[in-house]
Design a protein with these regions (language model features):
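Flexible glycine-/small-residue-rich
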Residues: 37-39, 71, 125-127, 171-174, ...
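Short, glycine-/Ser/Thr-/acidic-enriched flexible segments
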Residues: 41-43, 74, 100, 130, ...
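Long, acidic serine/threonine- and proline-rich intrinsically disordered regions
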Residues: 140-166, 172-307
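Exposed acidic/Ser/Thr-rich ligand/metal-binding surfaces
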Residues: 1-121, 180-195, 281, 286, ...
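Polar, glycine-rich mid-to-C-terminal structural blocks
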Residues: 66, 88-97, 102-165, 169-171
Length: 307
């Protein structure tokens, strides 16, 4: 490793093909068959088109060889390509910008990165119109599936590593409150639903997953009832509070039209609130690091406003 030097052109196609060739020699069902690609993604020799790269990655994914990517560098970093080929390779993508981030990905999270415990994980959430007028999923824009693809085991979806959790956040407009969409001309079935046996359900959650990539999917179903409802964000679980803090910070950075008057300081306050619980484990300091990031963004805001 110490003898490697970065120079000259980058032939990502040949590098991947060589890696797949070597992985094929030891390919074994039930084992970890994964390629770890470290690059800035600036491929200037051979295939550089994202779609063509994904075809190569998908073909080997279907043979049982996964691909994870680590992004390095700044100026020529092809973040989009790195994420896409990792997503389509049943892998993970991480950007390494510091020694601490490298330690987090390659040490603290190594088990989760390489050990997949659930394949092709799909989440489907149906809201009860008796309680919810509007909703939007925050994030996952490039991972959305058509409704009919949920039950199709041939459709590729996300992988879940050992010890990892996935958060899906929805912003909703409760029934009767002002929303972003104009009222419909024709009546809906809200009144009928309000009188049925499911009127205490806010929504219904379905999860599909495969124990192994080759297995048939298993279905989990769970009603989300009014018992699960919290009167305010401050009374929510600390992990939920932190997830909302991170999501709102990202929306603020993107200048989302839905963020309204939410400021960086609001994300800081919510993250600090989640850290105030003794049950929260932040041994690696990652959540504290996020708080520092929100504070830095707030400090830089006046400079950005002047530009």
């Amino acid at each position: 490793m110490n003898s490697l030097k970065a120079a000259g052109s980058t032939n990502g196609e040949d590098a991947l093909k060589l890696a797949y060739e070597q992985a094929s020699k030891t390919l074994k069902e039930g084992s970890i068959n994964r390629i770890l690609m470290l690059t800035d993604g600036d491929f200037n020799v051979g295939i550089s088109d994202v779609d063509e790269m994904m075809d190569l990655v998908k073909a080997n994914r279907d043979r049982g060889i996964s691909l994870s990517t680590l992004g390095f560098g700044r100026g020529n970093l092809n973040d989009y390509m790195m994420e896409q080929i990792a997503d389509n390779g049943n892998g993970n993508y991480s950007y390494i910008d510091s020694l601490s981030e490298a330690k987090k990905v390659l040490d603290n999270e190594l088990n989760a990165t390489f050990n997949t415990v659930a394949s092709d994980v799909k989440i489907q959430l149906e809201f009860n119109p008796a309680h919810v007028d509007e909703w939007r999923l925050i994030g996952y824009e490039n991972r959305l599936l058509a409704e009919q693809e949920f039950n199709n085991d041939k459709v590729d979806a996300g992988e879940l590593g050992a010890g990892k959790a996935v958060v899906a956040l929805f912003e909703i407009t409760p029934r009767g409150e002002k929303g972003a969409i104009a009222p419909r001309r024709y009546a809906d079935n809200t009144q009928a639903l309000a009188n049925n046996s499911n009127n205490k359900e806010l929504g219904f959650l379905k999860i599909r997953y495969k124990a192994t990539p080759q297995a048939s999917s298993k279905l989990l179903e769970l009603p989300i009832t009014t018992v699960n409802k919290r009167v305010s964000l401050m009374s929510a679980h600390p992990d939920t509070q932190f997830a909302v803090a991170v999501a709102s910070f990202g929306q603020r950075l993107q200048q989302s039209p839905y963020i309204n008057d939410w400021q960086y300081s609001d994300s800081t306050q919510l993250a600090n609130q989640s850290l105030s619980y003794q049950t929260v484990d932040d041994a690696n300091g990652l959540r504290r690091g996020f708080v520092e990031l929100t504070q830095l963004a707030e400090a830089l805001q006046p400079v950005i406003n002047k530009q």
